[in-house]
């Protein structure tokens, strides 16, 4: 992990616009967040903790530090799991701060043509499309069966550890959406709508189906929402804030069109945090 003050090339933008300075002032630097942060636990580096990142953001906003490539790398290194928020006595909205800064950094980044094309395909064509996701995951499944994922670093420019960390694609029988309705078992306790998500049906479909069975066993009729794919959480985490908002609005409209009075249940924490 590079030091966040290394690399002297600043981003071509007004440094003070990169950070939500008002929110950064809420941090009292108590350090309770350190034990909850996976990147701090991995590296032991203060810079890779929520407190350290807030210190960096504040320094950039106050023009005490340059918004270098190292600063951007540290912002990208955060998982935005928001576990730190659960223990913060000051109520710092760390997730909102990270999304704001990542969005501003993305606006000012100068990516190469291959990187721009890959992001356009992934965020504009694959994630918002059930067919696009199915084709992409099917291609990944074939590559894993043929042991071609080791070629990904050379072909797609991906880092080796990224391809090594990709989960095995489950069998096709598990990669299916929920039925339109799963009836309640026993005495009915009401109806719920399930947000299936985009990646969940393709890589963790059995979790969605287990969720539906559990809710049905508890007495709830489970309804899925037609034509819903992506809520925009992955876009927000990666600085694509405008499209994230568009997808969130579309998701809300589709759920309201089915039943705007039903509780919404989901099993993906990232989707839940984004939609809230």
Residue ranges and their predicted role:
Residues 1-75:
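Ferredoxin-type iron-sulfur electron-transfer modules and their immediate structural context
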Residues 41, 229-230:
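Conserved beta-strand edge residues that scaffold enzyme active sites
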Residues 15, 21-24, 54-228, 234-275:
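Iron-sulfur-cluster electron-transfer modules
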């Amino acid at each position: 992990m590079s030091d966040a003050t290394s690399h002297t090339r600043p981003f071509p933008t007004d440094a003070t616009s990169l950070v939500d300075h008002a929110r950064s002032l809420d941090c009292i630097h108590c350090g309770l967040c350190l034990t909850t942060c996976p990147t701090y636990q991995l590296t032991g580096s203060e810079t890779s903790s929520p407190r350290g990142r807030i210190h960096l953001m504040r320094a950039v906003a106050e023009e005490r530090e340059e918004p270098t490539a190292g600063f951007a790398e540290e912002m990208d290194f955060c998982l935005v799991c928001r576990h730190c928020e659960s223990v913060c006595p000051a109520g710092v909205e760390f997730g909102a701060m990270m999304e704001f800064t990542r969005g501003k950094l993305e606006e000012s980044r100068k990516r190469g043509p291959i990187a721009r094309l890959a992001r356009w395909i992934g965020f504009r064509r694959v994630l918002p499309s059930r067919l696009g996701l199915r084709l992409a995951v099917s291609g990944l499944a074939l590559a894993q069966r043929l042991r071609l994922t080791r070629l990904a670093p050379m072909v797609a420019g991906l880092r080796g550890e990224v391809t090594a960390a990709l989960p095995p694609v489950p069998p096709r029988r598990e990669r299916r959406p929920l039925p339109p309705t799963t009836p309640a078992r026993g005495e009915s306790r009401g109806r719920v709508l399930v947000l299936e998500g985009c990646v969940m049906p393709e890589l963790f479909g059995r979790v969605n189906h287990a969720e539906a069975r559990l809710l049905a066993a508890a007495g709830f009729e489970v309804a899925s929402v037609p034509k819903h794919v992506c809520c925009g959480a992955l876009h927000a985490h990666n600085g694509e804030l405008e499209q994230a908002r568009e997808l969130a609005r579309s998701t809300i409209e589709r759920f309201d069109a089915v039943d705007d009075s039903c509780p919404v249940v989901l099993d993906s924490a990232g989707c839940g945090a984004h939609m809230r």
